[in-house]
Amino acid sequence: MSMQKMNRFHWHLTEDQGWRIEIKKHPKLTEIGSMRKETIINRYSAAIPGIYDGTPYGGFYTQEEIKEIVAYAKERYITIIPEVDLPGHMLAALATYPELGCTGGPYEVGTR
C-alpha cells in the first residue's frame, strides 16, 4: 500500500457471501455464516447465467488475528476502516439466525 501512497485500508468484514469476523458471543456466525457452498467464477449479470466452481469455501479472522493486523497497519501509519455491512447484505447472518429475517427464509450464504 505504501508504494501506492495509500494509508487507508477499508476492511469489508461481512457480506452476503460470508461473515469474516469472529464474534465470541455469537460463534454460529463463523460456524455457519463464514461458509458458502460454492463460488461464482464468471462475471454475473441478468443476461449471463452464473458459472460456479462447486467447491465449498470459508474462513474468517479470529479476534487475535485482527488485533495483529491492526497493530501491523498502525506501525506503518495505515488506518484500518472496518465495515460490518448491516442491515443490508445480511445473507450470511440470516443463514445463521433466520429468526432475524422478515420473510421467513429459508436463507443460505450467498454465492454471487
Question: What does each of the following model-derived ranges do?
Answer:
Residues 1-112:
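Substrate-binding cleft of carbohydrate-active enzyme catalytic domains
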